Amino acid sequence: MTSRTRNHRMPTLLLSLVLSAFFCASLGAEETREKEKKSAVQAIVGATVLPVSGPMVRRGTVTWKDGKILEVAAELAAPEGARIHDAEGLYVCPGFVAVVAMGVGIETSSGNIGNGLDPWDRELTIALANGITTLQVLPAPFFGGFGQDGPLYGGSNSAVIKLTQGDLEGMLVKEPAMNYFSLPRRQIELNYFLLRERFKQAKAYLAKRAEARAKKATEPKLSSSLKLYVAVLENTRPTIFSPANNHEVKIVLSLSREYGFDAVLNEPKDAWMMAADLAAANVPVLVKSRGPDFDFNTTGPLFEKGQMAPVRRPAAFVRAGCQVSILPYRRGISLSGLAGRDLATLHVDAAFAVRGGMSNEDALKAITLNPARTLRVDDRLGSLEKGKDADLLILSGHPLDYRSFVLKAFINGKLYYDREKSRIYREIPLTGDK
């Protein structure tokens, strides 16, 4: 190598070393800033706080760090150095939990939902702007239960996700979230018999598996046709049915008692007449407060058969002691056609339930803590309590007031929606009482 070549390469080598040191220092500084940002205590002060799990807190303060709530109290001084969010005259409540949603935040029609998460789905912003921070998502436009014309089948392809838009980290909460069954309305007794037979086979399999494990022997092979039934009997997640009438409700209760699994009823329209039985069996219900399944021109005989206006059903279940979660009329987000009847108006559906006799407290619980309990994630979500995830909303008014807007939405302690910086609802003036 000539001296001229060496002389040319020396500046290049020095430049490379300088640039490497610069980028390493920049990356280190960025990591430090991110770490400091994540670990900083944040506080909302001066708000009317609705914890859901307890009474309203006036002039309340909510503090959190590293994505977890530290304290919720009245007139609590924010820790020194905390990042303050002034909420004087505003409301704070937990993020809404949609107990069932279709296709939001995912790009998959089947298979593993965790591998098909889409944090850049534009519908996430719309949902966040309307207060939803968590939902159970199913990929297909079908929610299992009775009332289908196809064969007996079921599945567990569902997941609980958070709407961390643009951020895959922390998005997946739980997968699978539920089991669900389709039991056709035709030949109901035959399918009931088949269902019981498969549960018997699953129970026998579990007994053989337990015996093999006790002897440290090879476990028996599990048939693919029994996997779902075994999962139901293991009861690691609830199982959901959609009964079309009270006869089918009784079938579900019978199976649940006999085999010891936790059942959930999706839209049991007439079951308000046997709501006390559901409450005694600790069976949660998912109900709509709006819908076309009621004819206001009907008279006595139809009412005697159990017809009740959808707006009154949630309150009827609550009065009996049932755990109620509110469903929107549509389980996706519509960007065209008839608006105001989908996930974007979940809080309005809760307000309709109040019109039908529910208290404000129960209605808010029906879109926060109750869905979290049904999905078995209430140890983290659904209320503002010490140690739970900092998923919360700052609103211009009471969350069930149709005039209220979400001003900020936090998930895992991070700000994911800011009305002032978003195109969603920013141009609409705030009105009404704060």
Q: Where in this protein do the model-derived segments appear?
A:
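Histidine-rich, glycine-flanked metal-binding segment
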Residues: 34-40, 49, 53-93
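His/Asp/Glu-enriched, well-ordered alpha-helical/loop segment
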Residues: 110, 238, 279, 288-291, ...
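C-terminal cap of metal-dependent C-N hydrolases
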Residues: 50, 385-429
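Polyanionic/metal-chelating signatures
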Residues: 128-263
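Bacterial N-terminal signal peptides
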Residues: 12-24
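Active-site core of metal-dependent hydrolases
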Residues: 113, 213-310, 325, 373-375, ...
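Bacterial N-terminal signal peptides that target proteins for export
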Residues: 2-14
